[in-house]
Each structure stands twice: as structure tokens, then as C-alpha cells.
Amino acid sequence: MTKKAWFLPLVCVLLISGWLAPAASASAQTTLSLNDRLASSPSGTGSLLSLAAPAAPYADTDTYYEGAEGKTGDSLKSTLHRIISGHTMLSYSEVWNALKETDEDPRNPNNVILLYTNESRSKNLNGGNVGDWNREHVWAKSHGDFGTSKGPGTDIHHLRPADVQVNSARGNMDFDNGGTEYAKAPGNYYDGDSWEPRDDVKGDVARMLFYMAVRYEGDDGYPDLELNDKTGNGSAPYHGKQSVLLEWNKQDPVDDRERKRNEIIYEKYQHNRNPFIDHPEWADEIWP
């Protein structure tokens, strides 16, 4: 028998018996969708480090941020402001449906994930009663007194679903470390003038505030929003605490949930991006 004659039957036997199946299986595993990876990861966070295959980039961000690379300080801040300004603005009522998509539970499409508690709650329970979720302004809307009209008050890059009672407890506090644990939201702490969110969203909070401080510079009829290193800012257009936010940006890296949310906002709703999700290192370049 020739070598070719006995080799082909042997390959067939190996395929049938499953000896070559692992290679095919491994190849198939790399085709999992982002939703599959999010749903299968702990708490749906889906860190890139925990994925067997890295997530493909969403958009051509090199083109989007053209002109920003290599800049630092005020030059970088002003360039990013120009890039992300002029976005499509939603009404406050339109925010409800947007959040139902941007913050959808990857394990249950009928629910949203609440920011401070990580609870999955029905999309239909949006409102103002106990047991409902409502629209949390991460940059407190009293800090600059911009309310809920189109603009910073409806910018979904910093609006997130939150339990009504937890949202009320946070109020308009600045962000800082320490305080007493809030019983209705374990892992969150508060004192007289500050709120500390749970560890898994500390970076999310920081990057949302970085975005707001770059997007709203007072040149388009909206307040000039700025970070500072204080708490108790009240109605001034400032939010703190800058040094703590920079620490949180490093402690809680960007995850796939943030990336997916950023992409949905860019593609479907506002058509602008949060630069600090795409390039978290830029925060230290602007606020050294």
C-alpha cells in the first residue's frame, strides 16, 4: 500500500474519534460575540484581561482623535473639546430609552444594571417611586446649575440608571474616599460632603467626570465645568475630588461594558465619544 493510500483513511478515523476536534473547537471559541463575553464574565464586566480572545476595536479612534496624539495639558484638552463638541442632544424624556439600551443587562435584555448597586432591575421600573430606578447625573446637575434641559443635563455620557433612594442619598455630593457605608448600597460610602462609589465603578465615575470637564468649556452657552481638588462645591461649576478621581481611573481600568456603552452612544445617540474610555492615559496628561 502506498503512503497516500493508508494516510487518508487514518485522517478520517482521527476526525471521527474526536482527536482533531479540539482544534476546531478552539477556533470556534474565538468567534464569541461581545454580549456573550460580557454575559459569561463575573458581574458582566468582561475585562479584556479575563477574555480568552481580546475584543476587536470598535471604531477607528485614530481617525476620530486625529490631531490629539502627542499633545498634553491645555493643548490636549482644547483639541479634545473641539473633537467631541457639536454632538446630537437628547431631550430629558429621550434619556429614558437611551439608558435602557446603553445600560442593558447583558444577561437579561429586559433589565438595566444600576450604577451604584450593580443590581439588575426591570427596564419598566423607571420613575420616581421607591423601588424604581431613575436618571443619575454623575456630574451633579447643581454643580453649574444646568438642570435637565438639553446639553449637560441630558448628556448620557454621564447619566446612568440608579436606584431612586440611592440616587437621593448621593444627592449632589462630590466624590472622595471614606465615610460611612450606605446600608442600601453596600460598598458605597458617604460623609457630610462626599460619596465613594463601589470599587467596580470608581474608574467609570472618574472617566465620566473627565469627559464633562472637557466637553463643557463655557463657549457654547453652557457652564464652564471644571474639576478641582475640593469637596462641598455646592452650586459652583466645579466637581471634585480631582486627585482621587485620577487615582480611581488607574485603580478601576476601562472594561468591555464601558467600551460597549461608549460605542452605542457614539453610533446611535449623540455621535460623540468619551475620550477617556478610549484613552484613559489622557487624564494624567491633562491634569498632571
UniProtKB/Swiss-Prot annotation:
Q: Under the cellular component aspect of Gene Ontology, which terms does the record hold? A: extracellular region
Q: Is this entry keyworded Plastid?
A: no
Set out the biological process GO terms recorded for this chain's protein.
DNA catabolic process
Signal peptide boundaries: 1-26
> InterPro entries, alphabetically?
Endonuclease-I, His-Me_finger_sf
Query: Where does it live in the cell?
Result: Secreted
Give GO MF terms, alphabetically: DNA nuclease activity
The EC number(s) given in the record are 3.1.-.-
Q: Keywords for this entry? A: Hydrolase, Nuclease, Secreted, Signal
Role noted for this protein: Mg(2+)-activated ribonuclease which hydrolyzes RNA apparently nonspecifically into oligonucleotides with 5'-terminal phosphate.
Q: What is this protein called?
A: Extracellular ribonuclease
Q: What is the species listed in this Swiss-Prot or TrEMBL entry?
A: Bacillus subtilis (strain 168)
- This protein's gene is called bsn
